[in-house]
Amino acid sequence: MTLGIGVIGTGAIGQDHIRRVSRALSGGRIVALNDINADNARRAAQEWAPDAVICDTARDLVARPDVQAVMVTSWGGTHAEYVLDAIAAGKPVFCEKPLATNAADCLRIMEAEMARGRRLVQVGFNRRYDSGYLDLKAILDNGTIGDVLMVHAMHRNQRVGPNYKTEMAITDTLVHELDVHRWLLDGEYVSAQVIFPRRTSKALPHMRDPQIALLETKRGIRIDVEIFVNCQYGYDIQCAVVGELGQANLPDPPAVPVKTGETLSRHIMNDWKYRFIDAYDAEIQDFIDRASTGSPAGPDSWAGYAASVAADACVRAQESGRIEPIEMIAKPAFYSR
C-alpha cells in the first residue's frame, strides 16, 4: 500500500520532507500541497511532486479523500489548528515541532485525540531517531555509568536570521533538548531558570545571545544547556551525561581527520539538515510505516505537551530572572499504553 500524504507548509523543512518522501523513502506519495504562498507550493510540486494537487486552504487538503495522512510543516503558530483538523478527519498527522506554541493548545489536541479513541499524532522530535542519541540512551538504560547526576548540553547554530527573537532560543531551539532529555532520562522536569552571559557582538540588536537554561528533574538531576545561535563556526550539538560511575557523551558525526601543514583538522557541519539527515529519514519512514497500518508510534502528543509546558516555564524565566516551576497535569492513561 502507498500512503497518500498531504503536506501543509512548503518552506525549508516542508520541502525537505517532500523531497525525502518522494526520493529517499518508501511507501509514501505526496498527493497534495498547501502553503500560505501558493507559488512556494507550486515550486515544491514542480521539483519534487509534479502530480501533487495545490490546495487553496489547509482544510481543503485535509478533506481530500486521497490524503490518507497529513504532514504539518508550516509556521509553528498554525500547528494546533491544522493538527486538530487532521484529528477531526480521523487522519494520522505528523507535526513538526512544536506541537503548539502554548500548553493550552497542546491540551486541546490531546483531548481531541483521546475523544477519537486512538493515537493519530506524531511530533517531529527527530533526535529520538538519531543513532548517537539512541546509543547514548542504551548506555543510560543499562546502567553503565550508574545513576545519572547531571547533564551538560550545548546547542550552537552558526547564525540566525533577522526574524529570530530572544524567546525563540527556547521555543524554536531549546525545545529539542527539552524533549530529548526527558526521553534520555525517562523523567519530568520540576523547574527552570534562564541566565544570560555576556552578549555576543554577532547577535542582532534586538536579541540576547547566548543563553543558558538550567533545569531540574523530579529525581534531582540537574541539566544545563547552552544555547548559542550565532556561534559563527558551525552547527554543533553536544550532550555529556555524568553518572555515579562515569560519563557518557553524545558522539560527533563522523568526519575524516585531516593532517596538513602542521595542523590537524576535522570538518564541522553548518546546517541541521545535514547533521540529522539520517534521523529525519528514519523518523518520516517510521511515520509512513505506522500510519499505513494503524497509528503512529513516535513521539506523541503528551511529549509535545511536556515540551511546551517546559518551554513556557523557560520563557517566563527569561523574563523574570527567577527559577520558575514546571507544573503538568497527571499523565492520561491513554498516553501510558
Swiss-Prot record:
Which Gene Ontology MF annotations are present? inositol 2-dehydrogenase (NAD+) activity; nucleotide binding
The EC number of this protein is 1.1.1.18
Q: Which reaction does it catalyse?
A: myo-inositol + NAD(+) = scyllo-inosose + NADH + H(+)
What's the short name of a Pfam family annotated to this entry?
Answer: GFO_IDH_MocA
Instruction: Decide whether keyword Transport is in the record.
Output: no
- What GO biological process terms does the UniProt entry carry, in alphabetical order? inositol catabolic process
Matching entries from InterPro entries are given as: Gfo-Idh-MocA_inositol_DH (IPR050424), Gfo/Idh/MocA-like_OxRdtase_C (IPR004104), Gfo/Idh/MocA-like_OxRdtase_N (IPR000683), MI/DCI_dehydrogenase (IPR023794), NAD(P)-bd_dom_sf (IPR036291)
**Which keywords label this protein?**
NAD, Oxidoreductase
UniProt subunit comment = Homotetramer.
Q: Which family does it belong to?
A: Belongs to the Gfo/Idh/MocA family.
Q: What does this protein do?
A: Involved in the oxidation of myo-inositol (MI) to 2-keto-myo-inositol (2KMI or 2-inosose).
| Name recorded for this polypeptide | Inositol 2-dehydrogenase
Q: What is the lineage of its organism?
A: Bacteria, Pseudomonadati, Pseudomonadota, Alphaproteobacteria, Acetobacterales
Q: What is the gene name?
A: iolG
